[in-house]
């Protein structure tokens, strides 16, 4: 007699459990970071939608309902609606450029009453679906077919370019995670080498100056020309010359964008990370910073590295075991701007200490490992590529967010998955992960 199928037993409860623990950490951290805001209203009104914690609790409730709905739906619907969701995301990204409101210099939000919706967060999810749908099509071969490869790059590049126009550098960088997906699916290793080389060129140009980069490039080219001097014309020589000319043009482009496109505070953040202020013994540029909680406080002019300095102080002061829940001085007195969003990790570091931050790191590593391992086991090409996409997106968010809180990455504004305050990001991350859980649950019922 055939055994009756139990859908609950097919879900990856390991992934769901990690998600739940991270969500719980996020709730406690947001409560701690917005404690003064809560106390300013009333402790009995802890779920008041006028507070950050109250709003986040509402979004957590929405996410729980959404998790149940996503797990109950037929997994085929995600394949069917992949291109539709991508099209809707593109329309929203265009609409927000025309009708969105300006927040911190970025025109990337729709204002709906006291709430805000950020289409870029959902565009990542939609791009993951669309890329998975395209690359799982019949006879699609990005390794040997250039047209297929450029189509995949276009699917990634269109929303990325629209997000760039919004001024949201952080979300733009997240789209780079799809390059790892292409590489995993057989694209040339150049897709990993080229970004690394361009990053090195950019760092040399910004840290030591465009003239230094051009001199290094010219000396390298002269050395290679000397090496080829006694040989007959070689096509490789022409290729080498083209590469070096390209490096020079790229370096000039980086310098032009840095000087004429980036704002003063963005240049100051990059300079601080590159150590230029320490070397030149100059104070960084200043910017307007308003404390998170005290809305009536006067604007204070602080050094642009204030966020990073205070974040590192908070993490370092936590020590091994932390100061205890609601006992963090940096947290309670709002020394760190944006502490409920971009700098939420320093709240955990101050109040929970080394053990708390280590636990968060371990949870993220386990989540990424389990996602990649789950993706490798998929029978469906769509599910496999989607799993790689989810892992890539979460990795970029995790790496950049924690990197900027400890001062090794410029402050570009990017949330910590499942922990940072924000309804759009929490909904998008939840959709990303839970759809993968559903696809994996149906893995054994997919024909090879």
Question: Model features per residue range: what roles?
Answer:
Residues 308, 312, 321, 325-374:
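A conserved mid-to-late transmembrane alpha helix and its immediate loop/hinge
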Residues 20, 36-38, 42-300, 346-406, ...:
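Hydrophobic alpha-helical transmembrane segments of multi-pass inner membrane proteins, especially
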Residues 1-3, 401-448:
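A juxtamembrane structural motif centered on a specific transmembrane helix
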Residues 114-126, 167, 319, 323, ...:
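Glycine/serine-rich anion-binding loops at beta->alpha junctions
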Residues 15-28, 92:
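N-terminal signal-anchor transmembrane alpha helix
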Residues 156-163, 303, 312-320, 324-330:
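Membrane-helix interface and discontinuous TM-entry motifs in multi-pass inner-membrane proteins
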């Amino acid at each position: 007699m055939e055994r009756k199928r139990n859908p609950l037993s097919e879900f990856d409860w390991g992934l769901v459990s990690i998600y739940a623990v991270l969500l719980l950490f996020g709730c406690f951290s947001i409560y701690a970071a917005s404690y003064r805001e809560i106390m300013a209203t009333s402790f009995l009104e802890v779920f008041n939608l006028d507070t950050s914690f109250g709003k986040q609790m509402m979004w957590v409730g929405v996410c729980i309902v959404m998790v149940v709905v996503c797990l109950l739906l037929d997994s085929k619907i995600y394949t069917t609606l992949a291109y539709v969701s991508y099209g809707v995301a593109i329309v929203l990204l265009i609409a927000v450029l025309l009708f969105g409101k300006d927040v911190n210099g970025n025109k990337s939000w729709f204002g709906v009453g006291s709430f805000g919706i950020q289409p870029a967060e959902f565009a990542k999810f939609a791009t993951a679906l669309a890329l998975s749908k395209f690359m799982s099509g019949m006879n699609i071969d990005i390794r040997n077919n250039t047209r297929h490869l450029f189509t995949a790059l276009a699917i990634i590049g269109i929303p990325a370019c629209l997000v760039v126009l919004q001024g949201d550098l952080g979300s733009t960088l997240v789209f780079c995670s799809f390059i790892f997906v292409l590489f995993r699916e057989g694209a040339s290793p150049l897709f990993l080498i080229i970004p690394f080389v361009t990053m090195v060129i950019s760092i040399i140009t910004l840290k030591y100056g465009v003239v230094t980069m051009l001199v290094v490039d010219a000396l390298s080219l002269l050395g290679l020309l000397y090496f080829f001097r006694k040989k007959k014309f070689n096509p490789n020589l022409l290729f080498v010359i083209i590469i070096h000319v390209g490096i020079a043009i790229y370096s000039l482009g980086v310098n032009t964008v840095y000087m004429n496109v980036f704002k003063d505070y963005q240049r100051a953040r990059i300079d601080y990370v590159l150590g230029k202020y320490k070397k030149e013994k100059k104070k960084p540029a200043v910017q307007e910073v308003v404390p998170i909680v005290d809305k009536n406080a006067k604007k204070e002019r602080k050094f642009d590295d204030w966020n990073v300095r205070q974040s590192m102080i908070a993490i370092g002061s936590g020590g091994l075991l932390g100061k205890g829940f609601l006992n963090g001085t940096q947290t309670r007195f709002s020394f760190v701007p944006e502490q409920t969003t971009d700098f939420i990790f320093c709240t955990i570091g101050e109040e929970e200490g080394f053990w708390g931050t280590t636990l968060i790191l371990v949870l993220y590593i386990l989540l990424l490992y389990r996602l990649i391992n789950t993706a490798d086991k998929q029978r469906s090409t769509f599910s496999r590529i989607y799993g790689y996409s989810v892992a890539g997106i979460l990795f970029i968010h995790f790496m950049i967010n924690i990197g900027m809180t400890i001062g090794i990455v410029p402050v570009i504004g990017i949330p910590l998955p499942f922990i940072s305050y924000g309804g759009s990001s929490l909904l998008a991350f939840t959709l990303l992960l839970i759809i993968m859980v559903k696809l994996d649950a149906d893995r054994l019922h997919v024909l090879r």
